[in-house]
């Protein structure tokens, strides 16, 4: 679990598409295999809001392990104080869920390779990996959202960190996509996320114009 802890330390940081469908795969093996749902994207892209709406309603996943939400519960007026303990609780909860072979989800910026080994280990234990990449073009929308979040009492992420993590996330996305059993890419630059691309065996482009933008950066 060391890879998980290292990744969590690096990651302590709307709406749902109308055409979303149940994410549980079909087939005898797929129906019995537990699923790890990875909600990924840069700081400020809207991962938490997306996950809270999408996972329970459309992926039938009721376990969302989020260190920020845990830290906020431990110390609501100063979540940073609860961050270290939240990291430990995340580790414990993930261990419990994976040992019980239950579906669960978590969010990450994917700005490091730490999850590759850990997710590969889950796959070796029979888990399926579903990756939802929440993409936003450029940095200005991300930083504006983060500053707006701070005024509402949310946590701050320095602009330099946002830029650095976004660049690394985009650079590493293909490696994580290769590990995923199912991939979905959403454009979340507007008021609601738009499904752009998905791959579950066959690749399907749902929005050609947006896919061209995403593909220029990510190289799907």
Question: Language model features by range: what are they?
Answer:
Residues 27-34, 97-98:
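Phosphate-binding P-loop
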Residues 176-220:
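NTP-dependent small-molecule kinase module
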Residues 38-41:
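The Walker A (P-loop) glycine that initiates the GxxxxGKT/S ATP-binding motif of P-loop NTPases
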